[in-house]
């Protein structure tokens, strides 16, 4: 109770669990900063209290206060200045930090890449960070070089490729129920799916509400059984769940639960949705359920992390005086 947090602040880079899960455990007197979009996404994902660990002092749906910033905003923490800079990642609203102390220039990349819809954000960040004294650099993609590749799995080169593959699957299956799911924090991918496919895309209602909040974009939507109505959604865009269950040609819709109710022999596109992969104990039972219904499972994955060659490009663009690898199991593979 007697701690002095006058010159203390915490920054969130983006809305993934490994960066946000324990937010509610941060002392309420410490300011918590992030980009506005990340604040929107975290609040949306924790709408029902299932995303963040609950505070022991609040109800289960509590999300602690965050201060939403615009890209380029500078926050003073004592004698330290922190600029929050937008980067491209598969969680929309991701940010890096450029930190200036009285004697040094320090850069933290957060998680970033060069193969997303907003790669120019990462390039502009690199320009801002040029010749930083210390570069704290993520290296997730170099951690798993020995992971076995899945035969016949589609391997999109970039986010645009994901949308092209979805459009192709629609064309190849004109009279077949097609559903999909993705990771909700990747709001940009959902936006591009809505824009870039031939069928009418129908999102689960909370995802449609998040798309509208972040991009001011309306989309058709449906409510899960028993879900409360959302005032921010246009009632004329609602499609009934039963209509979607019976459809074979008009809709591409986001399936988030009750996969046993999908049509036998239908097509399901798994685009970085949960369960995320074979490391998740729920993954194999999920695949088994689809197999029992003879539902074709197509995985369309596009990493939010810079590819190994792009990590080298980013380091070369920044030319840091000192490189500090983080967020990787093989830091020795990142070279300045």
Model-flagged regions — what are they?
Residues 149-262, 326:
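Hard-cation-handling environments
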């Amino acid at each position: 109770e007697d701690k002095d947090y006058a010159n203390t602040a915490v920054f969130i880079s983006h809305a993934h669990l490994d960066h946000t899960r324990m937010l509610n455990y941060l002392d309420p007197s410490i300011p918590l900063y992030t980009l506005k979009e990340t604040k929107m996404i975290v609040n949306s994902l924790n709408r029902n209290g299932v995303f963040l660990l609950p505070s022991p002092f609040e109800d289960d749906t509590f999300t602690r206060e965050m201060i939403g910033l615009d890209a380029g905003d500078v926050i003073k923490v004592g004698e330290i200045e922190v600029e929050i800079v937008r980067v491209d990642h598969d969680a929309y609203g991701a940010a890096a930090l450029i930190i200036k102390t009285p004697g040094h220039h320090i850069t933290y990349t957060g998680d970033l890449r060069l193969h997303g819809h907003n790669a120019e954000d990462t390039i502009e960040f690199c320009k801002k960070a040029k010749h930083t004294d210390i570069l704290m650099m993520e290296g997730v993609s170099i951690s798993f070089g020995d992971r076995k590749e899945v035969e016949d799995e589609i391997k999109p080169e970039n986010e645009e490729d994901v949308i092209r593959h979805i459009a192709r699957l629609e064309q190849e299956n004109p009279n077949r129920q097609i559903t999909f799911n993705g990771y909700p924090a990747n709001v940009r991918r959902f936006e591009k799916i809505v824009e870039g496919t031939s069928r009418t895309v129908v999102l689960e209602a909370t995802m449609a509400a998040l798309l509208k909040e972040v991009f001011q974009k309306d989309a058709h939507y449906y409510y899960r059984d028993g879900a409360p109505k959302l005032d921010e959604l246009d009632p004329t865009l609602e499609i009934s769940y039963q209509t979607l269950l019976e459809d074979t040609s008009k809709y591409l819709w986001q399936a988030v639960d009750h996969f046993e109710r999908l049509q036998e022999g239908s097509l399901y596109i798994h685009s970085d949705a949960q369960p995320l992969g074979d490391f998740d104990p729920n993954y194999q039972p999920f695949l088994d359920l689809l197999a029992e219904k003879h539902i074709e499972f197509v995985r369309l994955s596009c990493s939010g992390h810079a590819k190994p060659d792009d990590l080298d490009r980013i380091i070369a663009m920044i030319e840091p005086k000192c490189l500090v690898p983080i967020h990787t199991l093989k830091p020795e593979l990142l070279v300045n």
